Swiss-Prot record, chain A:
This is Gas vesicle protein L2. Keywords: Gas vesicle, Plasmid. The keyword Transport does not apply. GO terms for cellular component: gas vesicle. Pfam families: GvpL_GvpF. Proteins GvpF to GvpM might be involved in nucleating gas vesicle formation. A minor component of the gas vesicle. Gas vesicles are hollow, gas filled proteinaceous nanostructures found in several microbial planktonic microorganisms. They allow positioning of halobacteria at the optimal depth for growth in the poorly aerated, shallow brine pools of their habitat. Expression of 2 c-vac DNA fragments containing 2 divergently transcribed regions (gvpE-gvpF-gvpG-gvpH-gvpI-gvpJ-gvpK-gvpL-gvpM and gvpA-gvpC-gvpN-gvpO) allows H.volcanii to produce gas vesicles. Coiled coil: none annotated. Belongs to the gas vesicle GvpF/GvpL family. GO terms for biological process: gas vesicle organization. Encoded in a 14-gene locus called c-vac which produces cylindrical gas vesicles only in the stationary growth phase. It is found in: Gas vesicle.
Curated annotation (Swiss-Prot), chain B:
It is found in: Gas vesicle. Encoded in a 14-gene locus called c-vac which produces cylindrical gas vesicles only in the stationary growth phase. The keyword Transmembrane helix does not apply. NCBIfam families: halo_gas_GvpM. GO terms for molecular function: structural molecule activity. The gene is gvpM2. Disulfide bonds: none annotated. Proteins GvpF to GvpM might be involved in nucleating gas vesicle formation. A minor component of the gas vesicle. Gas vesicles are hollow, gas filled proteinaceous nanostructures found in several microbial planktonic microorganisms. They allow positioning of halobacteria at the optimal depth for growth in the poorly aerated, shallow brine pools of their habitat. Expression of 2 c-vac DNA fragments containing 2 divergently transcribed regions (gvpE-gvpF-gvpG-gvpH-gvpI-gvpJ-gvpK-gvpL-gvpM and gvpA-gvpC-gvpN-gvpO) allows H.volcanii to produce gas vesicles. Induction: In PHH4 (a deletion of the p-vac locus) transcribed in all growth phases, maximal expression in mid-stationary phase. An unstable 6kb transcript able to cover gvpD-gvpE-gvpF-gvpG-gvpH-gvpI-gvpJ-gvpK-gvpL-gvpM is detected, as well as smaller transcripts. Gas vesicles appear earlier when grown in static culture, possibly due to O(2)-limitation. It comes from Halobacterium salinarum (strain ATCC 700922 / JCM 11081 / NRC-1) (Halobacterium halobium). This is Gas vesicle protein M2. Belongs to the gas vesicle GvpA family. Keywords: Gas vesicle, Plasmid.
């Protein structure tokens, strides 16, 4: 922790850790149930006119050198969001470690100031969830097929058999380049097909970097992630989305990872108090 | 196919997402240091090997909870 962060921790006396914002119009705020928050803190809802922030009281932000501790916080955070989602429906999720200073009064001031914007966002996300789709590809079956059927590759191979050493070297380079070109085209086609498959059932789609910041030991060496999509879709279309993905997953060398339903983390907007209301 | 939330890759996914995404609030009352979110890139980079989380039993309660939900009609 930096000295500045240490100072911030020391100064926070009446903090509110915010998990998410929920629609409390039809469900009383007190219905948050028995879910317990990070470090077993009591979770409650601070509500202003049908828009509620799911919070626990805290006296510090959450940062630690102990990685296992951070992992527990993250899982608990998600657990709370899952639990309140069951009660209130799709939440507007906050990024981990969103902490207000100034107690309930600061929080209710913020809820009142941003109320039209929060209302619009909650209404927009109602009934929808985020699903995440990763297309992993093992190129070996494709390469086996292409080397047996591509005319250019076949011709290069035949010429290599009759060429001298210098020419063979150049022909091998051409062979590799042609194979790489076919592989690139296939990757591009698979990524396009995936986008086309999810598009009919998606409210929004965001294409994302295929590398995560975290190491995923469950990915085999041979499988390369070639497309990663965050898909916002109505809960009622979850099966349809799964069916669309079945078609892509049936292709040679393709593995589809389909996770969710998540709160709309990717599609949640940044909320600035000073911006014009969008209601 | 049906989506999952319990496999190791789903866990990697949500931790990655949770640290990177979600609504960011910009308001005077939000605790930051010089406008910079307190939990930054360095922490994300430090969290590796998420599948080992199951070894610590961190997910036991969560797993059970989701199995129960999935079993409901």
């Amino acid at each position: 922790m930096t000295p500045a962060q240490s100072q911030a921790r020391a100064q926070l006396s009446d903090g509110r850790y915010v998990y998410c914002v929920v629609d409390t119009t039809s469900v009383p705020s007190a219905s948050v149930g028995e879910t317990t928050g990070i470090d077993d803190e009591t979770v409650r809802v601070v509500s202003v006119d049908g828009v509620g922030a799911v919070v626990h009281d805290c006296t510090s932000v959450y940062d630690a050198d102990d990685i296992d501790q951070v992992k527990r916080w993250l899982v608990t955070h998600q657990q709370v969001v899952d639990d309140v989602s069951d009660v209130f429906g799709t939440p507007l999720p906050m990024r981990f470690d969103t902490v207000f200073a100034g107690g309930d009064s600061a929080l209710t001031d913020w809820l009142a100031d941003t109320h039209p914007r929060l209302r619009t966002e909650l209404d927009g996300f109602a009934g929808c969830w985020e699903y995440r789709v990763t297309l992993l590809w093992d190129p070996q079956p494709f390469e086996a097929h292409v080397t047996a059927t591509d005319d250019t590759l076949q011709a290069l191979e035949a010429r290599q058999a009759e060429a001298d050493a210098g020419t063979t070297f150049l022909l091998e380079k051409q062979y590799d380049a042609r194979l790489a070109e076919r592989r690139r085209a296939r990757r591009s086609a698979l990524a396009s097909d995936l986008s086309a498959a999810v598009e009919p059932v998606a409210t929004q789609v965001a294409s994302q970097d295929t590398t995560t910041s975290l190491r995923d030991e469950s990915v085999s060496e041979r499988h390369t992630p070639i497309a990663r999509l965050a898909v916002l879709a109505p809960e009622t279309d979850e099966s349809a989305l799964g069916s669309q993905l079945d078609d892509i997953a049936a292709r040679d060398g393709v593995t589809i990872r389909f996770t969710g339903p998540w709160p709309p983390y990717t599609f949640a907007p940044d909320i600035c108090t000073d911006e014009p209301n969008q209601a | 196919m049906n989506p999952t939330k319990r496999n190791s890759h789903a866990i990697v996914e949500f931790v990655d997402v949770l640290l990177r995404d979600g609504a960011v609030i910009q308001a005077d009352a939000i605790v930051t240091v010089a406008g910079v979110p307190l939990l930054g890139i360095s922490l994300r980079a430090a969290i590796a090997g998420m599948t080992t989380m199951t070894e610590y039993g961190i997910f036991d309660g969560w797993d059970a909870d989701h199995r129960r939900r999935n079993a409901q009609p």
